[in-house]
Amino acid sequence: MAEEKTSCVLRLFGAPQGQLAGAVGQFAPQWKTQAQWKSRGGETLLALQAASPSGLKKAAQSLQAQFEADLYGAGDTSLAAAVVNALETHDRLLVCSDAAAGALLEARLETVPGAEKVFDFGALSYAHPKAGPQIEKRARARFKAEEPDAVRLALARAQAARRVVGSELAAGCAERGSEKVLVLSSKKGCWLRTVPSSDNAALWLLDMIRRA
């Protein structure tokens, strides 16, 4: 019989640090569980160490209940692997509407097993000899003679890519000064997030996809 664990590592993305500290501070004394965490950018690795398996379980369940949307995995699970798993589970295809988004996602997903089943790596979308120009044409047609700013064009491209390819999700990216504006289009609507160019935009975009 396998020995029950008294320690684990939880992985979160986008969890507010103040709320995380508050949640750990509310652990019941009888759980006899200590927590340490380290954050970089939006990602947090949180290590739990308990005196007993039951204490560990209760502490982990408490965090899961409070940070359900932010908690993406445990142990060695990467955010990219969590995204591929979510896409597979919901039978969704993800494409990119421009090379900038492709560069962010392809480097993260190329080594994840099964990624080719749920992500086109540009083959059906922006890098396709016919679909790519079609996406650009459809996107610019929305503005007629007007020259759109980079963010509006990225949003229009993402919406066009989803329709041209017939995918459930389409991601885009635009530069705006010292920032990157990340775009995600789905049948439900569109999401935008602005991150500093110095931040890891690929991880923020992956998190948007995971939550969609």
Task: Enumerate the language-model features and the residues they cover.
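Beta-strand secondary-structure signal
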Residues: 9, 45-47, 181
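Short glycine-/aliphatic-rich beta-strand segments at the starts of folded cytosolic domains
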Residues: 2-17
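Short amphipathic alpha-helix segments
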Residues: 13-34
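Short beta-strand
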Residues: 35-40
